[in-house]
């Protein structure tokens, strides 16, 4: 009799995705981040669910309810900090996952890549709305500044902002709807992630060489299940080190001050994982221009397949492109640093140069380098 896992309608799906899936024999640890993102999402949904049991989405009680969770709820503090730092781990995994995709040419799988970009946008929206919920100073002013960017849209901008706010400023209505959206979006992310996986399994995984691995496949289980478990253990170790030893390391002290519309914090800045985009936004001295640059800084990922001029898929055997890739990584780290600095000399000019460099690298230098490499190999 055939094994039940190969015949049962539900188990068959699991089997074909996680057990008998033919996987390339040479995928490195950079391929671990997909499963780690899945673990992060499950962890965020679970901790978020338990937080929602004690949280109240009203401006008068939101801040107090978070304090209540940390002080009075059994293990509330650990749930709260796992959720907050879990978001940071989520974005670390996201950036690594996208970086892997760029380096090894995974964007050639168009559907998988584009759904991935949609997932990135959705996750960023979810994280932004989650940051507003504790209703601290940075929550309130972050929400005010970011939602206000929509007013740069010609003609409908102001109406749009007031529609999102549910009034004439960030207030009760805004907090309530942000909580509702923050609750529902992770489930939408989970659904889109399923589609992401579905399209990936149509083609099979890419591998470090960028060459077809159809002639050299191994079963996902036990090889990559055990490898994923190791990755998961390391992820949980990193998360718990943060949660138990430095829970506020990545947070902003201003968020321990209740929201006050009459008092603006000296430096309004988002969580660390948005700082690179925030730096690009601030580097353009025009509101609409800044907003467009902000959106384009992420949306540029959609153009990657069009900007691929190399005859090789991966950067594994392309030293010039490798150098440019790591310069891009350094540039993003520079932007992240600048995003957290006050708007004054020399930070303004550094931010502007880093922003120009970001778009120049992706749109001009990397495609040019690929063409040069093609010619060097006399192709």
Swiss-Prot record:
One of its GO terms (cellular component) is respiratory chain complex III. Keywords: Electron transport, Heme, Iron, Membrane, Metal-binding, Mitochondrion, Mitochondrion inner membrane, Respiratory chain, Transmembrane, Transmembrane helix, Transport, Ubiquinone. Heme b b566 binds at residues 97, 196. Its cofactor is heme b. It holds the Pfam family Cytochrom_B_C. A ubiquinone binds at residue 201. It is found in: Mitochondrion inner membrane. Component of the ubiquinol-cytochrome c reductase complex (complex III or cytochrome b-c1 complex) that is part of the mitochondrial respiratory chain. The b-c1 complex mediates electron transfer from ubiquinol to cytochrome c. Contributes to the generation of a proton gradient across the mitochondrial membrane that is then used for ATP synthesis. The cytochrome bc1 complex contains 11 subunits: 3 respiratory subunits (MT-CYB, CYC1 and UQCRFS1), 2 core proteins (UQCRC1 and UQCRC2) and 6 low-molecular weight proteins (UQCRH/QCR6, UQCRB/QCR7, UQCRQ/QCR8, UQCR10/QCR9, UQCR11/QCR10 and a cleavage product of UQCRFS1). This cytochrome bc1 complex then forms a dimer. Heme 1 (or BL or b562) is low-potential and absorbs at about 562 nm, and heme 2 (or BH or b566) is high-potential and absorbs at about 566 nm. This is Cytochrome b. It comes from Kobus megaceros (Nile lechwe). The gene is MT-CYB.
